[in-house]
Amino acid sequence: MTIILKNKHSLEVDDFKFKCCVGKNGISKEKIEGDNKTPKGNFKLEKLYYRSDRLNKPFTKLKCVKINKNMGWCNNIKDNANYNKLVNTKKKTKHEKLYRKDFKYDLIIPIKYNWQGRKLGKGSCIFLHLTKNYKPTAGCIALSKKDFLIMLKLISTRTKIKIF
């Protein structure tokens, strides 16, 4: 199955169309760290990370990982070893915290953009995550909790996302 994002407001999964939002500066083939753009292309999905203190384990065929207080995603363009990877927040490297006070990362699926042949500065922390108000993101794709939970029931470890 392929998740399709044809425009910045609609995510298609099987026969479902979900309202969504993307990066503040739209969708682009040319992506750099901090440009607020959602990367264009075909990508695999990582496992589901979720806040078990706020949600029960969702039904999905994806591998599920509980988010803890020490989880982050490295966005340090000078850290070749950890850039665009899951890191322990106790490491002395710049990162996006996954354990947040707000709800946005209660459910996240990292999109495997800039994973293989990782290039420093080409963008990191590109996730599917939650939103309530559909305000543009820093480059991620966000949808409502209700829609995210429906999507989780439909996708599997072989699902890809096509962004164009």
Which residue ranges define each predicted feature?
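Cell wall/extracellular polymer interaction/catalysis modules
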Residues: 1-138, 146-164
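A conserved hydrophobic position in a structured secondary element of the catalytic/binding core
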Residues: 143
